Amino acid sequence: MSQVTVGENEGIESALRRFKRSVAKAGIFSDLRRIRHHETPVEKYKSKLKQRSRNRRR
């Protein structure tokens, strides 16, 4: 779970931006999409290929 503490002089907008960035970095939305929708075997294979190419770029 992502958690962001808001500083005294920090605005809500910047804290929200930091929270969204941490959620994206943790991969929470991609997990939700995967869990909520059924994937056919072909879609699973394609998503694994995409993930491998993303990891190779890093």
Swiss-Prot record:
Tell me a GO cellular component.
ribosome
Query: Coiled-coil annotation: which residues?
Result: none
Q: What does the record give under GO molecular function?
A: structural constituent of ribosome
Pfam name, any one: Ribosomal_S21
Instruction: Tell whether Disulfide bond is among the UniProt keywords.
Output: no
Which GO BP terms, alphabetically? translation
Q: Keywords on this record?
A: Ribonucleoprotein, Ribosomal protein
Q: What Gene3D superfamilies would the database entry show?
A: Ribosomal protein S8
NCBIfam families the UniProt entry points to: S21p (TIGR00030)
Which family is it part of?
A: Belongs to the bacterial ribosomal protein bS21 family.
The record, for HAMAP family, names: Ribosomal_bS21 (MF_00358)
Q: Any idea what this protein is called?
A: Small ribosomal subunit protein bS21
The species is Parasynechococcus marenigrum (strain WH8102)
Gene expressing this chain? rpsU
